[in-house]
UniProtKB/Swiss-Prot annotation:
Superkingdom of the organism of origin: Eukaryota
Single GO cellular component term: chloroplast thylakoid membrane
TM stretches of this protein: 21-35
Location in the cell: Plastid, Chloroplast thylakoid membrane
GO biological process, one term: photosynthetic electron transport chain
Subunit structure as annotated in this protein's UniProt entry: Heterodimer of an alpha subunit and a beta subunit. PSII is composed of 1 copy each of membrane proteins PsbA, PsbB, PsbC, PsbD, PsbE, PsbF, PsbH, PsbI, PsbJ, PsbK, PsbL, PsbM, PsbT, PsbX, PsbY, PsbZ, Psb30/Ycf12, at least 3 peripheral proteins of the oxygen-evolving complex and a large number of cofactors. It forms dimeric complexes.
Cofactor(s) required, per the database record: heme b
Protein name per the record: Cytochrome b559 subunit alpha
Keywords on record: Chloroplast, Electron transport, Heme, Iron, Membrane, Metal-binding, Photosynthesis, Photosystem II, Plastid, Thylakoid, Transmembrane, Transmembrane helix, Transport
Matches recorded under PANTHER family: CYTOCHROME B559 SUBUNIT BETA-RELATED (PTHR33391:SF9)
Database matches in NCBIfam families: cyt_b559_alpha
Length: 83
């Protein structure tokens, strides 16, 4: 015989008005907040990733590829200086 944990059944939760009032506000709010986070460019600043127009500069049109195993730090410094 299984015991009763005292939790509310899931069917009761998703059929309640209170559940839908709360989630009809929070789910679209999270979607809008995420869209604004990305569309304003704040995501690029927070995570430090380059913006689409910063991948290639006028002076450097080739891919910044690290080729040396032992001088990789110098190559990274060279790439960042050219930015």
């Amino acid at each position: 015989m299984s015991g009763n944990t005292g939790e509310r059944p899931f069917a009761d939760i998703i059929t309640s008005i209170r559940y839908w009032v709360i989630h009809s506000i929070t789910i679209p709010s999270l979607f809008i907040a995420g869209w604004l986070f990305v569309s304003t460019g704040l995501a690029y600043d927070v995570f430090g990733s380059p913006r689409p127009n910063e991948y290639f500069t006028e002076s450097r049109q080739e891919i910044p590829l690290i080729t040396g195993r032992f001088n990789s730090l110098e190559q990274v410094d060279e790439f960042t200086r050219s930015l």
